[in-house]
Amino acid sequence: MVVDDSAVVRQVLVGVLNDAPGIDVIATAADPLLAIEKMRQHWPDVIVLDVEMPRMDGITFLRKIMSERPTPVVICSTLTEKGARVTMDALAAGAVAVVTKPRLGLKQFLTDSADELVATVRSAARANVKRLAARVTAAPLEAEVKHTADVILPAQSGRALAQTTERIVAIGTSTGGTQALEEVLTALPRVCPGIVIVQHMPEKFTAAFAARLNGLCQIAVKEAANNDRVMPGRALIAPGGKHLLLRRSGAQYFVEVLEGPPVNRHRPSVDVLFRSAARAAGSNALGIIMTGMGDDGAAGLLEMRQAGARTVAQDEHTSIVFGMPKEAIKRGGADRILPLGAMAREIVTQLQ
């Protein structure tokens, strides 16, 4: 079902999704109240939802759905600061993913983004929303050419030189990751290793996400900027639309934020972060791959393990989408498989 107050958006989304094999849009609605009436007749497998609508806003509608009958919801939001803040509230309330739409050139943009829309809806249909709904406590695919991390950071042999004893944590996640990261980071004490994070998310949204977490956590959380120090008690989140690399200068770690082609169709890419962590930190790192579709991060986690790092994959039961962790496990990149609730303890105890 598509719920959006724009007739143009509804028309284009229906056309794009109905053209995809295995997807059938059973209904559309201009606002949540109309959607509720239609859902009484035929409940959808996935809902594509705008967040700013008349009569009832999307967040209220989403909370109603998640409390009564948990259903995968994909947020379709405008690429603005206000849209980003509202979308963060939606993700906290149980939405599984977000796709963006501009204020201008809307029809062409949605048509050009057809592959992303279809992939996101397919992923949402597989999401473990019952697990997600139980966790809720608060009131992007790009180019067709699939690059590897080599386009950003060429592979090299050998382990990282042990020039420092400072420990770091590298975390990669995608679909369902906003809720998973909130659960992990809010459980951490103020004194913990420095953390670098890639969460697949559009540009402009990561700053709002980091700000929200910063207000909830004992540790500091911010959107990473070029040359930021990686310090104990602070987490840096890759900005949407840019890659994040871990670097080292003497005994200190810092991050590099840079442009470049999408890797595994993502920018930022988990593989890029993990490869840089393997190279810069070696055995002083802990790599964690969590819920998400696809295989981004699977190769990089294996590189971290081969460089001497401890590596962990989230288990299937607690993953919203068991794609990235499953692939990492299959390739031998994870030396431990843990439920989400054990991740914070792993960060604190394994890196002491």
Swiss-Prot record:
Known EC number: 3.1.1.61, 3.5.1.44
Organism: Xanthomonas axonopodis pv. citri (strain 306)
SUPFAM superfamilies for this protein: CheY-like, Methylesterase CheB, C-terminal domain
Similarity field: Belongs to the CheB family.
HAMAP family: CheB_chemtxs
Protein name: Protein-glutamate methylesterase/protein-glutamine glutaminase 2
A GO cellular component annotation in the UniProt record: cytoplasm
Purpose: Involved in chemotaxis. Part of a chemotaxis signal transduction system that modulates chemotaxis in response to various stimuli. Catalyzes the demethylation of specific methylglutamate residues introduced into the chemoreceptors (methyl-accepting chemotaxis proteins or MCP) by CheR. Also mediates the irreversible deamidation of specific glutamine residues to glutamic acid.
Enzyme class: hydrolase
InterPro entries recorded: CheB-like, CheB_C, CheY-like_superfamily, Sig_transdc_resp-reg_Me-estase, Sig_transdc_resp-reg_receiver
GO biological process terms, semicolon-separated: chemotaxis
Domain Response regulatory, chain residue ranges per copy: 1-116
Superkingdom, taxonomy of origin: Bacteria
CDD domains referenced in this protein's UniProt entry, alphabetically: CheB_Rec, REC_CheB-like
Residue ranges occupied by any CheB-type methylesterase domain in the UniProt entry: 162-352
UniProt gene name: cheB2
Domain notes: Contains a C-terminal catalytic domain, and an N-terminal region which modulates catalytic activity.
Protein modification: Phosphorylated by CheA. Phosphorylation of the N-terminal regulatory domain activates the methylesterase activity.
Residues with the 4-aspartylphosphate modification: D50
UniProt KW keywords: Chemotaxis, Cytoplasm, Hydrolase, Phosphoprotein
Molecular-function annotations in GO: phosphorelay response regulator activity; protein-glutamate methylesterase activity; protein-glutamine glutaminase activity
Active site: S174, H200, D296
Catalytic activity: [protein]-L-glutamate 5-O-methyl ester + H2O = L-glutamyl-[protein] + methanol + H(+); L-glutaminyl-[protein] + H2O = L-glutamyl-[protein] + NH4(+)
